């Protein structure tokens, strides 16, 4: 399971040209995303409440980014996803299917991909086989997203209790381990391990 259960969203000013990349910054008990958007950075600290309290997490952010950072809300969540999204006449989309970590673009991408799969492939033959195929697609898709998320925890940091505990308890999933080993296969856009559909870590990501 993924190790974090709290998110502390905030914004930072963006002066000058917008960078063409997102920063993922290791913190004492989790990591910060820093995404350049129009006129500012959208940021958030995701962390494990067993290792740091909400007030201490706010203090850590202010030490790193400045005392004026406004952080009015702490979001609590339990990471996971449903094994089935299509049961009888009910079909789940978006947060109804699960929540992994607050990666909005990845969540939107997964929702759209599920709808495309549903309408293009399975509505033409709405039977148990279509349900099973759609649920299998959903499972494979989220396994790849979990793989992608684990990359945020594979940086080698070991100077706090959170990171030491994570290293002892966590083994990188197959895809994450493969990427960290420098790429043991040629990257390709359509990943057969995701039923031939696009991966959340596509070929272009191997090049950066």
Regions found by a protein language model. Give the residues of each.
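FAD/FMN-dependent oxidoreductases across multiple families
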Residues: 38, 47-158
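Long, low-complexity C-terminal extensions of enzymes
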Residues: 120-208
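Tryptophan-centered motif/residue detector
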Residues: 31-33, 77, 86, 90, ...
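Predominantly flavin-linked oxidoreductase catalytic cores and closely associated redox partners
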Residues: 1-66, 115
């Amino acid at each position: 399971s993924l190790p974090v259960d709290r998110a502390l969203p905030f914004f930072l000013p963006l002066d000058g040209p917008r960078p063409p990349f997102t920063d993922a910054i290791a913190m004492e008990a989790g990591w910060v995303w820093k995404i350049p958007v129009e006129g500012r950075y959208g940021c958030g600290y995701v962390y494990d409440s067993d290792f740091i309290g909400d007030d201490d997490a706010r203090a850590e952010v202010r030490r790193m980014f400045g005392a004026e950072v406004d952080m009015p809300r702490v979001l609590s969540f339990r990471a996971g996803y449903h094994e089935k999204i299509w049961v009888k006449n009910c079909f789940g989309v978006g947060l109804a299917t699960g929540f992994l970590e607050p990666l909005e673009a990845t969540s939107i991408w997964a929702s759209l991909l599920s709808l495309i799969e549903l309408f293009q492939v399975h509505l033409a033959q709405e039977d148990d086989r279509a349900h099973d195929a759609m649920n299998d697609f959903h499972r494979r898709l989220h396994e790849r997203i979990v793989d992608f998320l684990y990359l945020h925890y594979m940086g080698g940091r070991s100077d706090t209790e959170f990171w030491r505990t994570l290293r002892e308890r966590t083994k990188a999933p197959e895809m994450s381990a493969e990427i960290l080993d420098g790429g043991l296969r040629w990257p390709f856009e359509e990943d057969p391990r995701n039923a031939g559909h696009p991966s959340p870590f596509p070929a272009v990501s191997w090049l950066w």
